[in-house]
Amino acid sequence: MYKRQSTKTAYYHLPGLFEFYDLYSVFLPLFYSHREYFYDWCDIASVYGAPADCIWGGGRVESGNRDPRKVLALLREYGISARLTFSNSQLEPVHLADKKCNALCALFSENDRVQNGVIIHSDLLLDYLKSHYPNLYFVSSTTKVLTDFADFLNEVKNDDFLYVVPDFRLNKAFDRLNTCLLYTSPSPRDRSVS
């Protein structure tokens, strides 16, 4: 039997929620049934992405058209959080009625073991999702390009966000980023779902 050796875990957030479904349907069973093949200090916290043609998307070009129910079932099987990438910064109120995006949020908010989330750029969309899909958690998108450290710190202190993804230009500001670690939360898989 495999025994974990390390006490600290690095949680990875993987891309291609819909786009790489075929890969994950092979990789995840291997990862969890043969942990001895992988470092014991790493685990998967979430897989993120959006299907093609989602108006709320926009931060990344996606090409996956997998059935959202199958995608969600695969991640649920392994206790991994799914994150919809809805980082369109140009949304207007008329876009909030989009049937495809609302159906995805309704499906992903039906959590049984692990809470799912949305990576988000637009404050308009954030307010809408908070009121319509309160079971989802929110991640502030790197597409906001918060390069001023004070702006980044304000975002970290915003209670609406479970996570804030810094702009890559702040990645090496270790002395200042360590201060922000005081505000971080555990992996969504470690949060209880009520």
Give the ranges of each region predicted by the language model.
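Glycine-rich phosphate/ribose-binding loops and adjacent secondary-structure elements
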Residues: 141-176, 185
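Active-site beta->alpha loop and helix N-cap motifs at the rims of alpha/beta catalytic domains
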Residues: 16-23, 45-132, 137-147
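A short acidic, amphipathic alpha-helical/loop segment
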Residues: 25-30, 128-132, 151-155, 175-179
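Single conserved hydrophobic/aromatic residue that forms the stacking wall/gate
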Residues: 1-3, 183-193
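Short amphipathic alpha-helices and their capping/turn segments at secondary-structure boundaries
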Residues: 24-39, 65-76, 177-182
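Alpha-helix termination/capping residues and helix-transition junctions
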Residues: 38-41, 110-112, 157-158
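N-terminal basic/disordered segments at the start of proteins
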Residues: 4-42
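Glycine-enriched alpha-helix->loop->beta-strand junction motifs that scaffold or abut catalytic
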Residues: 114, 132-138, 156-164, 181-182
